Amino acid sequence: SNINIFVGNFEDIEKNMTEKYDYITLIGVFEYAESYINSKKPYIEFLRIVKKHLKKNGKIIIAIENRLGLKYWAGCKEDHLGTYFEGLEGYREDKGIKTFSKNELEDIFKLVGFYKYNFYYPYPDYKLPITIYSDEYLPKLGELNNNFRNFDLDRVVTFNETEVFDSIIKNNLFPIFSNSYLIILE
């Protein structure tokens, strides 16, 4: 069989993992590292552990919300904790989960020894993307007009997201305010 499925606490399972992999996917997983990695720097330690299981030229694929995503400024609740502005305010308490900005993620990657990575920008987010943008192909004015996709939580509307996205695009800031990221680490 080409697929092995492991269920349980990552630290317990990882001790028995001996294989190396071409690809490791962390889809909606990385943000929970402080819940299952016993370390003062759980996000760094988690990536270090995962990196040990990559084959030469292997890749890690991460999908994660951007804590500075425009949807949070516009009135969506933080996806995991269900509260307004939690990520924008820097997660004042450790609650077992944390998302990151692009710069914060890049800092973590470099501390772990990943210097080659590509960011992609799923729109409206990675869970149900309509389009995936890249640094080579960023959105154009008027393209980001499908912004009312907060399926599981109530939201308020604080401004017209399409107009604000257009302003962000004009100022070359879309990678900073994308609602989520799809990242390939090499």
Q: Each PLM stretch: what is its role?
A:
Residues 59-84:
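Conserved class I S-adenosyl-L-methionine
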